[in-house]
Amino acid sequence: MQIQISTDRNLHRDAELIQSFETELESKLARFSDRLTRLDVHLSDEMGGGTDGEDLRCVIEAFPIAREPVVVTNRAGSVDDAFNGALSRIEHVLATLFGRTSHHKGGESIRHMPSDNHR
C-alpha cells in the first residue's frame, strides 16, 4: 500500500508530522493493506492562515483493488484533529466496505462449517 501525503501552500510541510501521519495510517489501516493499492492524504487550510473555527481540512482517498476510490473529508481547528477525524472516518468506511464484500449472501455460513466434535 503506497501512501502519499500533500499539503496546500498555506500549510508548512513538517517532515516529522508527515512521518507520524504515515506511521499512523499504516498502523490503523494495516488490516486493509492487501486490499488497497494507494492512500492519498491532502491537508489544507481553507482560510489561508486564519484562526477562526474549523478551517483546516483533511481529505483521505483510498484506492481499493478493482473498485472505485473511496473519499472522506474532515474539518477541524488543528491539523492533528483534522487528520485523526479523517482517519477514523476512512477506517469505518473501509471496514463497512470490505465487511460487506466478505459477508454477503452465498458466503460461508457457520451452519455449513465442518464440526470439530466427533460424536
Which role does the model predict for each range below?
Residues 1-119:
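N-terminal, polar/charged subdomain of small-to-medium soluble alpha/beta proteins
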